[in-house]
UniProtKB/Swiss-Prot annotation:
ATP binds at residues 153-160. It is an enzyme of class 2 (transferase). This is HPr kinase/phosphorylase. Keywords: ATP-binding, Kinase, Magnesium, Metal-binding, Multifunctional enzyme, Nucleotide-binding, Serine/threonine-protein kinase, Transferase. One of its GO terms (molecular function) is protein serine/threonine kinase activity. Homohexamer. Belongs to the HPrK/P family. Disulfide bonds: none annotated. Catalyzes the ATP- as well as the pyrophosphate-dependent phosphorylation of a specific serine residue in HPr, a phosphocarrier protein of the phosphoenolpyruvate-dependent sugar phosphotransferase system (PTS). HprK/P also catalyzes the pyrophosphate-producing, inorganic phosphate-dependent dephosphorylation (phosphorolysis) of seryl-phosphorylated HPr (P-Ser-HPr). The active site is at residues 138, 159, 177, 243. Its EC number is 2.7.11.-, 2.7.4.-.
Amino acid sequence: MLTVQELVDDNADKIPFSWIAGHDAADRAIPDDGMAAADLVGHLNLIHPSRIQVFGQEELAYYTRFDLRRRMHHMDELLIGGVPAILLADGLTPPQDLIDQCAQHQVPLLSTPVAAAQLIDLLRIYLGKKLAPTTTVHGVFLDVLGLGVLITGESGLGKSELALELISRGHGLVADDAVELSRTAPGVIEGHCPQLLQNLLEVRGLGLLDIRTIFGETSVRRKMRLKLIVHLVRATAQDKFERLPLQDITQDMLGLPIRKVMLQVAAGRNLAVLVEAAVRNTILKLRGIDTLGEFMERQAMAILQSSK
């Protein structure tokens, strides 16, 4: 559960906050009920009291326009609604009654010199990433030709060896073994590596390899967007393979369908070349070029012409 203090600490470099009142409530939780980041923070809004309320110049002018009794009424509405924190932007000084109310009811009241609009944008980006749906999957996550590729498959099939071959061909490692995936936007899944495993690749027989030290800075990536899953299976597996699948295979990841390619592992197959070819083909499909569809159209035209 994200707290107000964590929010302050995590954004200290971009947003310098100063505590005014309610410091004892620094561990107050910011609600996460599957709400979008845009609903978690915004300008002063009494209709949505449960979000972080930001006072800019216009909001403070609106608030101070009322008499003390009306202000107390508005504050009561925010408090009953469970406001997590009140932030004053533009370096504004709050009226004493606002300070007293926040101190009395233990509501965090903070000030920052950052402009209100910029403050809201920064916090929405932060909250969108911090509270994004996440999962951890087993596999190797790579940057192949600028595309985020997750290599999966049962243990012992050579996922790490394949990753090492791709890295030696100029591609980049994001994460090995434990890949943390986050849905940071409606159509975006980002993958990154846990801090403990950064830059490391475990290869059977060689142990742990520090890819960054061995291959240089350009051989690792901090994060990538997941666009393709390459699933390795044994050549003896009973899975039924279609040589020319009429429809793209997808796999659900955090509620999003991700393109999936299945490759059989067998002696003599150059999997690194196959993965690169799969990535290039995926890039073409993302650009609207369907090689199989074009072939089927040509085939249909040829059959039509031969029947005349």
